[in-house]
Amino acid sequence: HEPEVDRPMLAYVKGDKFSLAVDAGYSKKHVQDFYRALRSCDLKEPDFTVITHWHYDHTFGLHDISGVSIAHQKTNLFLREQQDRANDKKYIDILKKDDTHFAKEYAGENELNIVIADIEYVEKMTLNLGNITAHIFHTVSPHSEDTTCIYIPEEKVLFLGDSTSEDFFNGGYMDKRKLQHLIERIYSIDCDYCVLSHCEPLKKNE
């Protein structure tokens, strides 16, 4: 996580056969910085990239990723809406005006390249990465209705994206019923660590 531009954390899961990234980043620059960090650790670019939700800081780098992208069907629906809005060349300026972090990330840029994910799922799907399993599932969340989480049972790690946060695209509204449903879902999963996109990893009981 990079607070000066509010870049979300991009995670990497390595199996014996395949690798997986969590989220596609804020921009082409974000993706390139992530891949540069992977190369410095002698890690290859990911075979799969799973999107946690449609918000632009998690998806506007999707056009520059390697491998195959995966998202919930609602995520692609929202991204298609963003594509339509981006047909208006002024849309990037509107986003810059509305979000100072976006303005910093896209300083000097005057166009957007918004794409949808290659693979859509509805309820859940599983990837065998080679002695590492990624359980990908949709869940109720107060943050966004297309929320995807990724559970790695061998590591007892649960990637939550921004799922516990309020809905910033709805006036910062926090639906407590949805939050309670999400908390119950988290507690039902055998994980030791929960990884959110904009803060340090937490132990489950935190």
Language-model features: where?
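Active-site-proximal loop/helix segments of hydrolase catalytic cores
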Residues: 133-186
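Active-site environment of divalent metal-dependent phosphoester hydrolases
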Residues: 7, 28-29, 54-60, 76-79, ...
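Divalent metal-coordination and catalytic microenvironments
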Residues: 13, 23, 38, 53, ...
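Active-site neighborhood of phospho(di)ester-bond hydrolases with catalytic His/Asp-centered motifs
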Residues: 21-24, 46-55, 70-73, 138-140, ...
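Active-site metal-binding motif and surrounding structural segment of the metallo-beta-lactamase
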Residues: 29-75, 187-193
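Metallo-beta-lactamase
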Residues: 80-138
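Divalent-metal (often Zn2+) His-rich catalytic cores of metallo-beta-lactamase-fold enzymes
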Residues: 72, 151, 178-206
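Conserved beta-strand hairpin/beta-sheet module of binuclear metal-dependent hydrolase folds
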Residues: 1-36, 148-162
